[in-house]
């Protein structure tokens, strides 16, 4: 078991290190005309000649917007616009953009040059098709899988890359895996650097910092979990399987009741039998559920998608998990 966990530490650290080196190599000479693709050289020449206004970028999904916000921090010539309310759940964004948010989206799209989407893994993502109605020249940047195919896309739960159903994406959000979050950041920077080459150095610096933070968090968490006596967790939400799988945690077996009134009893039984160190969820539970978890001595860890900084949110969740796994359980708990 120890060897297996040690191998997981080395494998995860290698993956993040590979992405860090790949992104650095990709942008080592962003202004070079010798190595740039013909399309890139043309785009850069046009951008240099016409860059009187900043490059305006649209985003709707909370994780995509939050990640872009971190990458664009301090980047001159780039303006990020959010076209969906900050606290709107992802599954309600398509209806919002097709309804009461459509006029605002159209107004923003007319003045924008790019949109950040997840259409390759989220077919219900309507941001680009709607924005294109207002602006035929707007460019789509799919941050899950690049259109050109020159860089690998993210990996979905189960080892499959590529398209997924809407329910599959919402129930298995790939960005809970730090390697996928790093890939999304790299794909975003790759495309934006080509559209706004003058911002490439700052974008690359922000990407490098994010990669380093994720790599350090994964390394620390993997080492701590390799030394833990047990790795049992309780998943209050099915969508937390991605994080549990990425960290090779051991979810206890229990069935979430369809009737909310039956939840406290079922949860109390699962906590007593499984004795998990951590309870994972994507949203704050009600008071009764939170009290049951506290009384069991399990640590409640919430990883929300509706955050302005998904990188810090994931790092904080990993830190809370490793600290909980290192803390001895109270007697008779």
Language-model-detected regions and their locations in the chain:
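Intrinsically disordered, low-complexity repeat segments enriched in small/polar residues
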Residues: 7, 14-16, 36-38
């Amino acid at each position: 078991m120890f060897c297996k966990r040690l191998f997981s530490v080395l494998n995860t650290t290698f993956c993040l290190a590979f992405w860090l080196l790949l992104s650095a190599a990709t942008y080592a000479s962003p202004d070079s005309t010798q190595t740039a693709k013909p399309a890139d050289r043309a785009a850069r020449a046009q951008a240099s000649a016409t860059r009187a206004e900043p490059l305006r970028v649209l985003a709707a999904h909370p994780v995509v917007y939050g990640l872009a916000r971190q990458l664009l921090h301090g980047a001159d010539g780039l303006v990020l616009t959010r076209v969906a309310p900050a606290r709107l759940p992802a599954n309600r964004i398509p209806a919002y953009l097709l309804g009461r948010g459509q006029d605002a989206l159209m107004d923003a799209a007319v003045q924008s040059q790019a949109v950040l989407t997840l259409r390759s893994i989220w077919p219900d993502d309507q941001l680009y098709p709607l924005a294109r109605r207002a602006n035929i020249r707007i460019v789509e940047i799919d941050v899950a899988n690049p259109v050109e195919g020159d860089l690998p896309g993210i990996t979905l739960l189960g080892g499959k890359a590529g398209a997924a159903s809407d329910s599959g994406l919402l129930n298995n959000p790939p960005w809970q895996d730090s390697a996928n979050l790093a890939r999304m950041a790299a794909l975003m920077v790759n495309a934006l650097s080509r559209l706004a080459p003058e911002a490439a150095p700052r974008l690359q610096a922000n990407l490098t910092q994010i990669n380093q933070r994720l790599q350090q968090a994964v390394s620390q968490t993997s080492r701590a979990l390799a030394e833990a006596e047990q790795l049992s967790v309780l998943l209050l939400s099915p969508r937390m399987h991605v994080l549990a799988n990425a960290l090779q945690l051991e979810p206890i077996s229990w069935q979430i009741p369809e009737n909310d009134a039956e939840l406290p009893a079922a949860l109390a039984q699962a906590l007593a039998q499984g004795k998990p160190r951590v309870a994972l969820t994507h949203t704050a539970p009600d008071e009764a559920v939170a009290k049951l978890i506290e009384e069991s001595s399990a640590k409640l860890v919430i990883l929300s998608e509706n955050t302005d900084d998904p990188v810090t949110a994931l790092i904080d969740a990993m830190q809370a998990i490793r600290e909980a796994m290192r803390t001895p359980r109270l007697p008779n708990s």
